[in-house]
C-alpha cells in the first residue's frame, strides 16, 4: 500500500505539470472504485484550472476554483503523467480515470480498485473538514503529542503509530523502520513509553519519512512514481522484510512477528 512517502513523491512529481493548467476533459472508465466516482465528475472539471496540489495524510487534494478533487491511491493505485500524443496512449485494463490536459494525460491506475476519486465542492466548506480528512492525526506531529495521546493506552507502540488518529501517514514499513532507529521494541505498550523515548521516536519518524521521500518511496509490488519509476527505499531498510538476516548494526538475526494482522520486524538486541 502506498504510504505517506509514496503519496508525497507522487504529489511532487505531479504538481509541476498540473498547477496552472486547465483540464480539457475527464474520461471516467470505471466509476466503481472504493467509493463511486461522483456522478457528473467529468462535467464539473471540464475547463477547470488546477490551482495547486497538496497532501493530507495519504490523500492528494487537487484544488480548482469550484472545489477540490480528492485522490486516494488505495492498495495498488498510481497516478502517472503521460504525454498527450495524437491519439493519447491507449488505456489498459486497470486504467480507470484520465484527466486530459493540452500536452499530457494524468492517468489513475488501480488494479485492486481500493483507491478513490472524490469531489468536495467549495460551497461545502474547507476540504480539510471532509469526513475522510477531519479525523486524521496532526501534521507535523511532535513528541509531546505522541506522549500525551498515548497515556493510559495498552495498545503496542507500533499499533499506535498505525492508528492514524495520532500520527498520520505512517504505514507498516515506516513504523518498523522508525522504531528501529529509535531503539524501541514494537511490542512495548504505547502508554509506557517515556517522553524522552517519544522524542527519539518523533525524530526517527521524521528522518525515516524524509529518507523515503528522497529515495522515491518503497516499491514492494505495484508502486511507481508519476514518471513510472520505482522507489528504492526498501533496498536500505534496517529491519523491514529482513527476517533472519543479520542486523545492520549489531549482527543479531532480525525477528518477525505479527501485530494486528501485519508483519512486524525488529532487532531483539538494538530495540528494548
From Swiss-Prot:
Amino-acid positions noted as binding DNA in the UniProt annotation, renumbered to this chain: 94, 112, 153
Pfam family, one: Fapy_DNA_glyco
Residues at the active site: 2-3, 58, 262
GO molecular function: 8-oxo-7,8-dihydroguanine DNA N-glycosylase activity; class I DNA-(apurinic or apyrimidinic site) endonuclease activity; damaged DNA binding; zinc ion binding
EC number: 3.2.2.23, 4.2.99.18
The keyword Calcium is annotated on this UniProt entry: no
Cofactor dependency: Zn(2+)
Domain of life the protein comes from: Bacteria
PANTHER family attached to this UniProt entry: FORMAMIDOPYRIMIDINE-DNA GLYCOSYLASE
Subunit structure: Monomer.
Known role: Involved in base excision repair of DNA damaged by oxidation or by mutagenic agents. Acts as a DNA glycosylase that recognizes and removes damaged bases. Has a preference for oxidized purines, such as 7,8-dihydro-8-oxoguanine (8-oxoG). Has AP (apurinic/apyrimidinic) lyase activity and introduces nicks in the DNA strand. Cleaves the DNA backbone by beta-delta elimination to generate a single-strand break at the site of the removed base with both 3'- and 5'-phosphates.
Protein name: Formamidopyrimidine-DNA glycosylase
Amino acid at each position: 500500500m502506498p504510504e505517506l512517502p509514496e503519496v508525497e513523491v507522487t504529489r511532487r512529481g505531479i504538481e509541476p505539470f498540473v498547477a496552472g493548467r486547465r483540464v480539457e476533459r475527464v474520461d471516467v472508465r470505471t466509476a466503481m472504485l472504493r467509493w463511486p466516482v461522483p456522478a457528473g465528475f467529468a462535467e464539473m472539471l471540464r475547463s477547470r484550472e488546477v490551482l495547486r496540489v497538496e497532501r493530507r495524510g495519504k490523500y492528494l487534494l487537487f484544488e480548482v476554483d469550484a472545489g477540490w478533487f480528492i485522490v486516494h491511491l488505495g492498495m495498488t493505485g498510481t497516478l502517472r503523467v503521460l504525454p498527450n500524443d495524437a491519439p493519447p496512449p491507449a488505456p489498459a485494463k486497470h486504467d480507470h480515470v484520465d484527466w486530459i490536459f493540452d500536452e499530457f494525460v494524468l492517468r489513475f491506475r488501480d488494479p485492486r480498485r481500493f483507491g478513490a476519486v472524490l469531489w468536495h465542492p467549495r460551497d461545502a466548506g474547507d476540504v480539510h473538514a471532509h469526513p475522510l480528512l477531519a479525523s486524521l492525526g496532526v501534521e507535523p506531529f511532535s513528541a509531546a503529542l505522541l506522549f500525551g495521546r498515548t497515556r493510559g493506552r495498552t495498545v503496542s507502540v507500533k499499533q499506535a503509530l498505525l492508528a492514524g488518529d495520532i500520527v498520520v501517514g505512517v504505514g507498516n514499513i515506516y513504523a518498523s523502520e522508525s522504531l528501529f532507529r529509535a531503539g524501541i521494541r514494537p511490542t512495548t505498550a504505547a502508554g509506557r513509553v517515556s517522553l524522552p523515548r517519544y522524542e527519539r521516536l518523533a525524530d526517527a519518524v521524521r528522518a525515516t519519512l524524509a529518507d523515503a521521500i528522497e529515495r522515491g518511496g518503497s516499491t514492494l509490488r505495484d508502486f511507481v512514481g508519476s514518471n513510472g519509476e520505482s522507489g528504492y527505499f526498501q533496498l536500505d531498510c534496517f529491519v523491514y522484510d529482513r527476517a533472519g538476516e543479520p542486523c545492520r548494526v549489531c549482527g543479531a538475526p532480525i525477528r518477525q512477528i505479527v501485530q494486528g494482522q501485519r508483519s512486524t520486524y525488529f532487532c531483539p538486541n538494538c530495540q528494548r
